[in-house]
Swiss-Prot record:
Any GO BP: regulation of cell shape
Name the record gives this protein: UDP-N-acetylglucosamine--N-acetylmuramyl-(pentapeptide) pyrophosphoryl-undecaprenol N-acetylglucosamine transferase
The organism's place on the tree of life at top rank: Bacteria
KW Cell membrane (keyword) present: yes
Group of enzyme by EC: transferase
CDD domains reported in the protein's UniProt record: GT28_MurG (cd03785)
Reaction(s) catalysed (UniProt annotation): di-trans,octa-cis-undecaprenyl diphospho-N-acetyl-alpha-D-muramoyl-L-alanyl-D-glutamyl-meso-2,6-diaminopimeloyl-D-alanyl-D-alanine + UDP-N-acetyl-alpha-D-glucosamine = di-trans,octa-cis-undecaprenyl diphospho-[N-acetyl-alpha-D-glucosaminyl-(1->4)]-N-acetyl-alpha-D-muramoyl-L-alanyl-D-glutamyl-meso-2,6-diaminopimeloyl-D-alanyl-D-alanine + UDP + H(+)
The gene coding this protein: murG
Protein family (similarity comment): Belongs to the glycosyltransferase 28 family. MurG subfamily.
Cross-referenced NCBIfam families: murG
Membrane topology designation: Peripheral membrane protein
EC number: 2.4.1.227
Cell compartment(s), UniProt: Cell inner membrane
Originating species: Chlorobium chlorochromatii (strain CaD3)
Length: 362
């Protein structure tokens, strides 16, 4: 059996595919797995590093907006898409996969479209509450579409063969909170706030925390992942404190999650899957420039289920710290939110998806 995956550009699209591929080979060691990607995406280095075969195609996403310059650029992009479609048709004929899986990003569009033209079984895994253009268009003819948020269904024209499966994500084993705090050199009996914003960091989160750091540290521990963008600057400006751990990157996320009573972060699909799998209480600040504002849709889904609170990026400077402190001081509200978050969890998402792929091949 052969399975071809397409999804990349960013880790948010690639890592669900990698999790599914690993689970497929665990369930059925004879399955042959390969990936399709671009040389500019994260998949160009990550897929070979993990030992998977990678086929490269040249394709780019359409530019949003309207101007003569953008029109010309989009015409070039459409020409590249047509050329990549021809290449992927040849690839599908030579590789002859039993199932083609798309996990989003513009790289998945030509492969899924070509597979549908050739009558191949296709499975789409959509990570966000607001589906991308590729999912919305190609879901019409997909064998199965798997969504991570039930709200995504209403944006799909063909609602048959749509399943709520969740997002494959890293699974962490919860540890004792006091022991986890000790790993960061923090007091075991203080409420603890975890703030992170991705590898580069989130400037609006950093600015909000820095502006009211003394207020925070007066009553709570803070684990603060600053990211590479502001890391050195903040390190030079912030005074050491026994209640503060800060660094550009957190190596031990399992301990960081376990130490935290409240987590402040963006609303990317992978982060939300990790949070709900652990039943963590979250204060979400959606990235305002995400495509089609999909992070806001993701956050809104959890808010509507009572599983998170949300602060707009534009209001983070004034509202983030007061909201976080209020939540840290309200144990009853945190307990209810934790239960609600756990109800949105899909810790077995990778396994369920792998079994669906195997089922399509039969």
């Amino acid at each position: 059996m052969k399975v071809l995956f397409a999804g990349g550009g960013t880790g948010g699209h690639l890592y669900p595919a990698i999790a599914m591929a690993a689970e497929l080979q665990r369930l059925s060691p004879n399955v042959s797995v390969a990936f399709v990607g671009t040389k500019s995406g994260i998949e160009a280095t990550e897929v070979p590093r993990l030992g998977y075969k990678l086929h490269l195609v040249s394709v780019r996403g359409l530019k949003r907006g309207f101007s003569p310059k953008l029109l010309i650029e989009n015409l070039r992009i459409l020409f590249d898409f047509a050329r990549s479609l021809g290449i992927t048709i040849q690839l599908l004929r030579s590789e002859a996969p039993d199932v083609v899986v798309g996990t989003g990003g513009f790289v998945s569009a030509p492969l899924l479209f070509a597979a549908q033209l050739l009558g191949k079984k296709t499975l789409i895994q959509e990570q966000n509450a607001f589906p991308g253009v590729t999912t919305r268009l190609l879901s019409l003819f997909a064998s199965e579409v798997h969504v991570a948020f039930n709200e995504a269904r209403r944006f799909l024209l063909n609602k048959r063969h749509v399943f709520l499966t969740g997002n494959p994500a890293r699974l962490f084993q919860p540890m004792d909170a006091a022991q986890a705090r000790a790993r960061f050199g923090l007091q075991h009996n203080r409420p603890t706030l975890l703030v992170f914003g991705g590898s580069r960091g989130a400037r609006s989160l950093n600015n909000a925390i820095a502006s009211q750091l003394d207020t925070l540290l007066a009553s709570v521990n803070l684990i603060w992942q600053t990211g590479s963008l502001d890391g050195e600057k903040l390190k030079a400006e912030v005074k050491p404190s026994p209640y503060l751990w800060m660094a550009p990157y957190i190596e031990d996320m399992e301990a960081a999650y376990s130490a935290a009573d409240v987590v402040v972060c963006r609303a990317g699909a992978s982060s939300l899957a990790e949070l709900t799998n652990l039943g963590k209480v979250a204060l979400l600040v959606p990235y305002p420039y995400a495509t089609a504002d999909h992070q806001r849709h993701n956050a809104q889904s959890l808010v509507e289920h009572g599983a998170a609170l949300m602060v707009a990026d534009s209001e983070a400077f004034t509202k983030l710290v007061p909201t976080a402190l209020e939540l840290l001081q309200n144990s009853g509200k945190r307990a209810a939110m934790s239960v609600a978050a756990a109800k949105q969890a899909h810790p077995d998402a990778a396994g369920v998806l792998a079994k669906r792929v195997l089922g399509l091949s039969r």
